[in-house]
Amino acid sequence: MKAKLSSDIAYISLYLNNIGGGSAIFCVQARTITLTFHYICTIIPLTIMTINKEIESGDRPLNFLEEIIEESIAKGETRVHTRFPPEPNGYLHIGHAKSICLNFGLAKKYGGLCNLRFDDTNPAKEDVEYVNSIKDDVRWLGFEWAGEHYASDYFEQLYLWAEDLIKLGKAYVDDQTQEEIRLARGTVTVPGTDSPCRGRSADENLDLFRRMRAGEFGDGTKVLRAKIDMAHTNMLMRDPILYRILHTDHHRTGDKWCIYPMYDWAHGQSDSIEKITHSICTLEFDVHRPLYDWFIDELQIFPSHQYEFARLNLTYTIMSKRKLLQLVQNKIVSGWDDPRMPTITAMRRRGYTPAAIRAFADRVGVAKRDNVIDLGLLEFFVREDLNKVAERRMAVINPLKVVITNYPERKTEEFECVNNPENPEAGTRKVPFSREIYIEHDDFMKEPPSKYYRLSPGKEVRLRYGYLIKCEEVIEDANGNVTELRCSYDPASGGGSSSDGRKVKGVIHWVSAQHARRAEARLFDKLFIRENPDAADEGETFMDYLNPESLVVQEIFTEPSLGAAAPGDKFQFERVGYFCVDKDSAPGRQVFNRIVTLKDSWAKINK
């Protein structure tokens, strides 16, 4: 019942996030309060029955994008074509995963298409390595694109359209420096001032622009700007830059081009070329939409439409590519795939499943306002999926040796163990048992409190799938540390019962000392100790909130069946947590990454 209740609480949080635009944040007296499981449980009078019905049926409220699409369908506009347009200058993170799931998910739900388009307009920062990693991430999440496109595919068409704007008197070449352009743009309260070059004739601008393409000018000496309105209330409409000169080879076009389009120029026109119906961006691009529409209207091309939703923000997590790069460069983490990073490749290595990420992305909803999602929600979905698919194994993280004094010294037997109680088809396995075993240090207390059901002097406990044992003697070192236990066993208590019918509440896991395999466990935790590491106090940075215990490396003992596990295989170490075999594993020396604990230990610590 307790486990079921925790699941219900998590779903209440997700349910609320889909109501009224999807905000999971309430603002009370100018303070932003992020809803956590415990907070929701105490303040929200929703019944468990209502939530369970929604979960079982698979229904949830429509998000605002689905409402827009369904309204269009009702009017006969049935075509849905979306796109996911990453810039290939880094690795995707969990925020991108939400966008991937949204764009591909909408296309699938409404029988449409979703393109993968690389926004490769900045050759100085882009690389084919990132292109390949992005494709791997999208496929790993379970999606296949309708078409693979690149903004660079459209460089010629974008150039010709730029010439069209020049001929229409809607664009001009500017000789001002970047700083001069910035200062002349004005502020939100002060109008901008026209460039001295704004009055050039169309013929002069066309000649200069063609010479820019021919490579006659140096980097930064000229730009092409749209001629809109230097007094516009939206500063992005104050003659935005369309092209800049950059003598840098492109990873696809080589040295063919020395002028490159800016994002705002390439974005909407690429959408139009691909006949995208729903161009979905994050909220910060809301102010870009008037410019997006202006270009399409002036060129009189296919009218794609831009819509904005709130980006994903997670507690105890940073998403800034610049800050993530700092972590890598300063060797705070081992690389972009360090399992503590929020990148998709890191989550994959850690052992997160695509199904869990898809379920999380679906349930957090699509908001119109910025919100912050508790990291525990993501971990909840990871546990839910792994509980269904991960086979059970026994492993001891902090071993304490136990000698069963009345068990024959040379005897070995095997117990039949269930691989996954959630899936009968997973079958069973044999686990060896012998006179000496290892148990968890935490499963023994010399002076236990009341209602302590694990092992203590003179008390009995059941070994998982095995016998009842009783602690007869405690061996300590010179400092009083417990180093070994001497126990007796009841030979008639195998198979989960006892000859006299006595009941023993405590059940602990174990491994046979004779058969155990040594392995390395990497116990990962949150990378930051502050809920919002981006909100640094004066004189501090996000680096000041690093969790010194985000990685603990431990030598462990595992049951022998784990010797056949391969990198990427996932297991539940019974009573410990979920673990994944890491790529650093070598013959005779396996490495296991802790994916998540069995329970939300962080919430307990911070009560």
Per-region residue spans from a language model:
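N-terminal catalytic cores of NTP/NDP-binding nucleotidyl/phosphoryl-transfer enzymes
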Residues: 58-70, 74-135, 251-282
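Conserved short loop/turn motifs at secondary-structure junctions
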Residues: 85-90, 117-125, 147-156, 179, ...
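Active-site cores that bind ATP or allylic diphosphates and position pyrophosphate for catalysis
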Residues: 120-122, 128, 150, 164-323, ...
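A glycine-rich helix N-cap at a beta->alpha junction
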Residues: 131-152
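Core subunits and conserved enzymes of cellular information-processing
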Residues: 295, 364, 372-607
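Long, charged, mostly alpha-helical binding arms that flank functional sites
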Residues: 303-381
